[in-house]
Amino acid sequence: MRLYVAPMDATVVEVSGDGRVRFENEEWTTPTLQERRAIIYAAEIEVAALQELMEILESGKV
């Protein structure tokens, strides 16, 4: 996984089942409330962009 989180200028590369994250070139850490919110926001934006891509490709209008 690679998720760029613009407000933090950081990239999430792994997430554990207990909620810890690993940012690129860093060790595992438990994100603060602000960091969690920033990660969730970035993920929601990425999901929306991927959904739009899927809709375009599935419509066959490429």
Task: Give residue spans per PLM region.
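Alpha-helical coiled-coil heptad-repeat register
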Residues: 37-54, 58
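Short intrinsically disordered terminal tails
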Residues: 1-2, 58-62
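N-terminal acidic leader/helix
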Residues: 1-38
